Swiss-Prot record:
Source species, domain of life: Bacteria
Function noted in UniProt: Involved in the ornithine fermentation pathway. Catalyzes the thiolytic cleavage of 2-amino-4-ketopentanoate (AKP) with coenzyme A (CoA) to form acetyl-CoA and alanine. It is strictly specific for AKP.
Modified-residue entries (N6-(pyridoxal phosphate)lysine), positions: 102
EC class (word): transferase
Organism the protein comes from: Acetoanaerobium sticklandii (strain ATCC 12662 / DSM 519 / JCM 1433 / CCUG 9281 / NCIMB 10654 / HF)
Amino acids binding pyridoxal 5'-phosphate: 128, 238-242
NCBIfam families: ornith_OrtB
Name this protein carries in UniProt: 2-amino-4-ketopentanoate thiolase beta subunit
Length: 469
């Protein structure tokens, strides 16, 4: 009897498909009414930090250089109060084989897939992770399929995503490109079931644990070179894996650094809207992913996401598109480094945050990514203009996503905007209760929500009372 391949038929088998494609039975981690044992799940990787480093180093991943941005630091100090202006550094993750930190996630996932005997790997991703999986699969001799949400209903593709497809194909992957909408997950599940390949998801314990090496390296490198841990580490934030993994690595190294999430402000644009899909100039590290995934991580392609950023986030800031474009050009013209938009989102935030800090403090942008073709400033701005976006110089705080892109008239106008952390924490608790409406909360559930929100019992109980009225 043939399987029901209708949308509802495939979706009804999603848990079975996922279990077969990852080799993890997520039900074993469930504990209370809505809680699960996160640390037990993370231990499911079966690899120690040292083993993960060995896996990554064997394929040329990791041990990327830390670079001090002396000229950008000097520029930030021109706009800072006397005695202010922290030293700004970047960890140049563009030096990984596929051109981004996501090689760390992919190295672990692909290694594990081969160890378990899978013949290939599949990932649903707009690009950088796809390139990383394709690169690692090529090294491991595994087949690779990347599923992308690329086009609107008119067949117009976002240049950054098209560029990433080019890179994936160049590295030997088969790329399945889809229009915006619910068919992405359906097609992804169908391919997993049809091929029997490993789900190299961004959100498995294998992938997130792979980023722990980045945070650990940061702490070790700064102690060796500067005799101290970074005071602040800024992470570009979308699905939360970058921040989660980096923070966990810092913790394993015993570092006390403040961890800041940074996203591009795309407020007002709906990520699943066909008409708004090409109104944005950033396909990752933006609030359209960052906010929803921070306040409810379990919305991904696995039953329980290993990326849980609110557990580790001390601060969440946003910057506008024009500010990131400006800092991207600044990095190239002042430091001789041409990098892509994701890491430069965090750099725009760091440029602003450094001005609040003392001169002897250190702020680090923990990733860079490669640039070129559709990822570059020029094609992105040209594409925006073709889609009716007004591009001008002015006050970036007047920028409205989907309407205009405002490049700052001077660097001093780059200002990161803080988001109220307690508001995010309350949103997560509200989403947890909404997703588990029949939950009879016990102490384990309360403790879980305390950890999920990096808060305390009093805050969680008060929020639940407020929500339930």
């Amino acid at each position: 009897m043939s399987k029901d391949m209708s949308y509802s038929g495939v979706m009804s088998r999603r848990n079975e498909i996922m279990k077969n494609a990852i080799g993890i039975d997520y039900t074993t981690f469930e504990s209370g009414s809505l809680s699960f044992d996160y640390e037990k799940m993370m231990r499911e990787t079966g690899y120690t930090l040292e083993e993960m480093q060995k896996i990554q180093y064997s394929t040329g991943v990791g041990r990327t250089p830390v670079l001090e941005l002396r000229n950008i630091t000097a520029l930030a100090r021109k706009y800072a109060a006397p005695g202010k202006g922290a030293r700004i550094f970047i960890k140049d993750e563009a030096g990984n084989p596929s051109g981004s930190f996501k090689a760390r996630r992919a190295a672990n996932a692909v290694y594990h897939a081969k160890k378990l005997g899978y013949k290939g790997v599949i990932a649903a991703t707009s690009g950088n992770y796809g390139a990383a999986v394709a690169s690692q699969a090529a090294m491991a001799g595994l087949k690779c399929i990347i599923v992308q949400e690329c086009y609107d209903s008119k067949g117009v593709g976002q240049p950054e995503i098209i560029e990433k497809a080019r890179k994936c194909e160049a590295l030997g992957a088969e790329v399945v490109q889809l229009s915006v909408g619910p068919e992405l997950f359906y097609k992804f599940l169908s391919l997993l079931e049809e091929t029997g390949y490993f789900n190299a998801s961004l959100y498995t314990p294998f992938g997130i644990a792979g980023v722990e090496t980045l945070g650990y390296e940061l702490a070790v490198e700064f102690r060796e070179a500067y005799g101290k841990d970074p005071d602040v580490v800024v992470c570009s934030n979308a699905g939360g894996g970058n921040l989660t993994g980096t923070a966990r690595g810092l913790i394993k190294a015993g570092a006390q650094s403040e961890v800041v999430a940074a996203s591009v402000n795309l407020q007002g644009l709906h990520m699943a809207s066909d008409t708004q899909f090409n109104k944005k100039s950033f396909t990752t590290s933006h609030t359209g992913f960052g906010m929803p995934f921070a306040t409810w991580p379990d919305r991904s392609d696995v039953p329980r996401s290993a990326a849980r950023p609110l557990r580790y986030m001390d601060r969440y800031v946003t910057v506008n598109q024009g500010e990131v474009f400006y800092i991207t050009e600044t990095l190239a013209s002042l430091e001789g480094l041409e990098k892509g938009p994701a890491g430069n989102t965090a750099l725009a935030a760091a440029f602003s945050l450094a001005q609040e800090m003392d001169k002897d403090q250190i702020i680090v942008v923990q990733e860079t990514e490669y640039t070129g073709a559709g990822k570059h400033i020029q094609p992105q701005l040209a594409f925006a203009r073709d889609n009716g976006i007004d591009i001008k110089f002015g006050n970036p705080k007047e920028e409205v996503a989907g309407i205009n892109i405002i490049l700052p008239e001077n660097p001093g106008m780059i200002k990161a905007v803080d988001h109220e952390m307690n508001k995010l924490r309350k949103s997560l608790i509200k989403n947890a209760l909404a997703n588990y409406p029949d939950a009879k909360l016990d102490d384990s559930d309360i403790d879980f929500l305390v950890k999920e929100t990096k808060s305390d019992t009093e805050f969680v109980k008060a929020t639940i009372k407020e929500i339930k009225g």
